[in-house]
UniProtKB/Swiss-Prot annotation:
<dbReference type="GO" id="GO:0006085">
    <property type="term" value="P:acetyl-CoA biosynthetic process"/>
</dbReference>
<feature type="site" description="Transition state stabilizer">
    <location>
        <position position="239"/>
    </location>
</feature>
<feature type="binding site">
    <location>
        <position position="383"/>
    </location>
    <ligand>
        <name>Mg(2+)</name>
    </ligand>
</feature>
<dbReference type="InterPro" id="IPR023865">
    <property type="entry name" value="Aliphatic_acid_kinase_CS"/>
</dbReference>
<feature type="binding site">
    <location>
        <position position="15"/>
    </location>
    <ligand>
        <name>ATP</name>
    </ligand>
</feature>
<keyword id="KW-0479">Metal-binding</keyword>
<comment type="subunit">
    <text>Homodimer.</text>
</comment>
<feature type="binding site">
    <location>
        <begin position="283"/>
        <end position="285"/>
    </location>
    <ligand>
        <name>ATP</name>
    </ligand>
</feature>
<dbReference type="GO" id="GO:0005737">
    <property type="term" value="C:cytoplasm"/>
</dbReference>
<feature type="active site" description="Proton donor/acceptor">
    <location>
        <position position="146"/>
    </location>
</feature>
<feature type="binding site">
    <location>
        <position position="89"/>
    </location>
    <ligand>
        <name>substrate</name>
    </ligand>
</feature>
<dbReference type="InterPro" id="IPR000890">
    <property type="entry name" value="Aliphatic_acid_kin_short-chain"/>
</dbReference>
<comment type="function">
    <text>Catalyzes the formation of acetyl phosphate from acetate and ATP. Can also catalyze the reverse reaction.</text>
</comment>
<keyword id="KW-0547">Nucleotide-binding</keyword>
<dbReference type="Pfam" id="PF00871">
    <property type="entry name" value="Acetate_kinase"/>
</dbReference>
<keyword id="KW-0963">Cytoplasm</keyword>
<keyword id="KW-0808">Transferase</keyword>
Amino acid sequence: MSKTIAINAGSSSLKWQLYQMPEEEVLAQGIIERIGLKDSISTVKYDGKKEEQILDIHDHTEAVKILLNDLIHFGIIAAYDEITGVGHRVVAGGELFKESVVVNDKVLEQIEELSVLAPLHNPGAAAGIRAFRDILPDITSVCVFDTSFHTSMAKHTYLYPIPQKYYTDYKVRKYGAHGTSHKYVAQEAAKMLGRPLEELKLITAHIGNGVSITANYHGKSVDTSMGFTPLAGPMMGTRSGDIDPAIIPYLIEQDPELKDAADVVNMLNKKSGLSGVSGISSDMRDIEAGLQEDNPDAVLAYNIFIDRIKKCIGQYFAVLNGADALVFTAGMGENAPLMRQDVIGGLTWFGMDIDPEKNVFGYRGEISTPESKVKVLVISTDEELCIARDVERLKNTK
């Protein structure tokens, strides 16, 4: 009985999913939140049940111990040795990791060094990897990188128009993110359309709290909206997305609360986007409630959000010289029909038309009309399954 855990560890959280492999059956899933803070929360879902505990969890090692003990306590596994592999989501792999890899000491050290590219994500991932290696040293640990899928971009696409020494000396370039999600939904889109992925031109829109759009040509990423860090691209839940970089020194000069570039970047990452403009929330459901109340700040935030996403999708029609399908995925992409309606409403010139009933009530699958030249699909992303598959593929190669 081979079981694999897919892990997404953040700075203060550890999200997990346990699979029976190779059957790809989900046995249990959960999340541990507020790691390092008082009143940490551990949630376990299995067999239609939900168990929640309030604990004091001081670090990721303690979180992993609690997770594993819960698996035994709730009868999900009988012993640790049933787990044969662990897969870790890592946001930034830089140019070092073009595909998923089995973890060793050198890989872990490189992931920590790459934290400069994803300071909000890589340190937590490294902590999760260390914790599992300490507690389950004999099982295979695999890293799956958000950036790997985008290493197929051409040099003229991933380089910024600044002196090349900043790339050669400091590796400043576009890396992208959400690659595992974009790869998965492109594969699923090909199945849904009944055509080989190698023949398709797709635009995949991962729209959650983080937002990224990718141009997929014959199964390869040829451009993506996130850049050197996941801050780039369209407006997001709490992130600004693209802004004029000259704003950064200007704000440091003008606002005494912003003392340096790090303060401004923190504001752009955590206090901007839907949340910053609306003053309400980063959650689209709260923004839509504000629309119903004619809240002017909610209306403004929503309009900027739609405008930025439409522009990004439009430019990828140019990159691909047309597209066979547009795919919506992730939290908002899958669950916000009003957002999808308003995005498509500004792209009808490209030959897209959605069925209003399918858009609102269909939830998953094709929501475009039969006459639509470009198919519009809603596909649930499953990054955890992608991670588990890579563990299964690599666990006998270490």
